[in-house]
Amino acid sequence: KAVALTLKRQPDCNVSYTDDAILRFNRADISMAVAVEGGLITPIIKDAGAKGLATISAEAKELAGKSRDGKLQPQEYQGGTFSISNLGMFGVSSFNSIINSPQGGILSVGAGQQRPIVKDGALSIATVMTITLAVDHRCIDGAAAAAFVKEFKGILEDPLQLML
């Protein structure tokens, strides 16, 4: 949901590169990386921006199960506009993903870890998560990528935005 909202606010990152044109999308069809026997597949949460968190969670669980069981239909894994890879659930704190062409970008999500931070001049402990964004610079420039990361960070730091 956070990526879909970010793409709505930063539409220059919801694009794909082709030999003929840069394609721009109005919907956020989010591909999620799922490990399967012998490789990886990226089923799609279609129009994720129009769905609530509970619906997205249920769809992600269902699609991951179908992926692992080898029961995905082509329309369930073809045509995504942006990808997410989450190795954080395996305790990996930081990693780089490879762009799922022709998509313009992929967000790598690392594990949340407790770290010391300084807030208002005082030392405290906070859960900190590392993300890495890889973009195809033929269709997404560095300024747009930086704006995406800034927007995504802001949404995660104010998660009530996901409820609106």
PLM ranges: what are they?
Residues 1-164:
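C-terminal catalytic/motor cores of large multi-domain enzyme assemblies
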